[in-house]
């Protein structure tokens, strides 16, 4: 079973739909309606932390889930920022606000980015980013903007199955979005 943490975002159910297309059982819980003991009792095989309209500090249990890291985690947008915050990175205002805009990324080709073109277009909806200079040693960058490598588009933990993407793989205009979700579910 896949647990999706809903950070009160309209894109949450696009993620749920993609996960469902991979024939996965799904439970959706809002970020303020579940506790860590309840998550443990649900025994999810993986957790997806959704986008949302706030900062990681305002994202309910999202950061605590990352700190607990009981199962593999994929964080999307706010979920990605929550991963950064959980390990000590600063979350700052992006140099430019992106809402519904496409950008081209480059990536590591590993884990969630396995078997994908080296560069492809993604859709971004965010005004906050992980400050690259504060990324802790526990995390590594897996994706950046092709035209600005200081803007982090993907991260992963160096020893735990924790992955984050700043962009929205569930957006219809993001290339390879379903592949990224499928890669995570198959890790």
List each language-model region with its residue ranges.
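Cysteine-nucleophile active-site neighborhood
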Residues: 44-115, 181
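Short, charged N-terminal beta->alpha structural module
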Residues: 2-22
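Acyltransferase
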Residues: 171-187
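Short amphipathic alpha-helix with an adjacent loop that forms part of the alpha/beta core around
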Residues: 35-43
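Histidine-centered divalent metal-coordination motifs
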Residues: 77, 126, 168
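Short hydrophobic/Thr-rich beta-strand motif most characteristic of the beta2 strand and flanking loop
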Residues: 26-31
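Conserved hydrophobic/aromatic beta-strand scaffold that supports enzyme active sites
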Residues: 102-104, 152-154, 164
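Catalytic beta-strand/loop cores that center a nucleophilic Ser/Cys/Thr
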Residues: 111-160
């Amino acid at each position: 079973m896949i647990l999706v943490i809903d950070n009160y975002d309209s894109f949450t159910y696009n993620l749920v739909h993609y996960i469902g297309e991979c024939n996965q059982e799904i439970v959706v819980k809002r970020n303020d309606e579940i506790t860590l003991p309840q998550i443990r009792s649900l025994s999810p095989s993986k957790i997806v932390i959704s986008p949302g309209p706030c900062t990681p500090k305002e994202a309910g249990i999202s950061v605590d889930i990352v700190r607990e890291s009981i199962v593999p985690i994929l964080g999307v947008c706010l979920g990605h920022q929550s991963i950064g915050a959980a390990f000590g990175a600063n979350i700052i205002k992006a140099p430019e606000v992106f809402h519904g805009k496409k950008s081209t990324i480059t990536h590591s080709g590993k884990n969630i980015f396995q078997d994908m073109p080296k560069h492809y277009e993604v859709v971004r909806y965010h005004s906050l980013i992980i400050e690259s200079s504060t990324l802790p040693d526990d995390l590594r960058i897996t994706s950046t903007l092709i035209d600005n490598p200081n803007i982090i588009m993907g991260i992963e933990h160096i020893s735990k199955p924790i992955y984050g993407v700043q962009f929205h793989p569930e957006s219809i205009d993001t290339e390879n979005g379903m592949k990224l979700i499928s890669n995570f579910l198959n890790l």
